[in-house]
Amino acid sequence: MPSLFSSLLTTLVFHILIYYQINLVTVNIIMNCFQEKQFSRENLLKMPFRMVLTGGSGSGKTIYLLSLFSTLVKKYKHIFLFTPVYNPDYDGYIWPNHINFVSSQEALEYNLIRTKSNIEKCIAVAQNHKKSAHFLLIFDDVGDKLSKCNTLIEFLNFGRHLNTSIILLCQTYRHVPILGRANITHFCSFNISISDAENMLRSMPVKGKRKDILNMLNMIQTARSNNRLAIIIEDSVFCEGELRICTDTADKDVIEQKLNIDILVSQYSHMKKNLNTILESTKTKLCNSDQSSSSKNVSS
């Protein structure tokens, strides 16, 4: 009996070692194929993009989005937000007259149609002056209304022809319109389930095997689970021919609610003359090394 037990134990240990060696080889193959890289926010300025930020409530989606603003406003001077309820996090980041409250399907469709018309007029004016205008539409927690919005689907599929980029903040991939998923350029995961990621990537054009991407995504999420980490998968165009998964985190100033006044000043709005009143209504602290120069920009 002791010899039989010893033999069984030896066999069990042998199989365990083989199992871990196989998995270690698999991990090494994936790591050798795909690289984890710091996300280059400047790449978002190269061409129109369609980004999806997916994660549960409190996962850090909005804070990360706000961290992108200091980069995005270099190109996108017209930023519009669509949200069902007032969110104070956007105070000081988007002009109040560019925030659309859409509590119903009809309200979303109506406001998007109006916005599209205004974008077309603005582009025509800019072309007459031999200039270019770029637009960014943000949809925060709009839910199932996104998947049923025909105008949004048009923007996802053809928005690049209107110099328009799209950012969707969703708690689940199900809220991303099925007819627009093939045109998503950036998928940002905030600790979502692998099954949700798999469903999202099914339609998205990516470089490399989706199975390897999902394994790499799972490894990064598991290894860095204590951080509010954005794991970003780019499409086959934005990845610049590389097999890579990018990671990024929110900026410290944004987390600490230190507002950079230049973010608002860089955007176009008829409300610029009311900037001081708008800033006084927020409870954030200004983080601006040269407030006097910014004030001159406002008056000009």
UniProtKB/Swiss-Prot annotation:
Family annotation (Pfam families): Pox_A32
Transmembrane parts of this sequence: none
Top-level division of the source organism's lineage: Viruses
Family label: Belongs to the orthopoxvirus OPG160 protein family.
Subunit structure: Interacts with protein OPG137.
Function in brief: Participates in viral DNA packaging and virion morphogenesis.
Name of protein: DNA packaging protein OPG160
Organism expressing this protein natively: Monkeypox virus
Protein encoded by which gene: OPG160
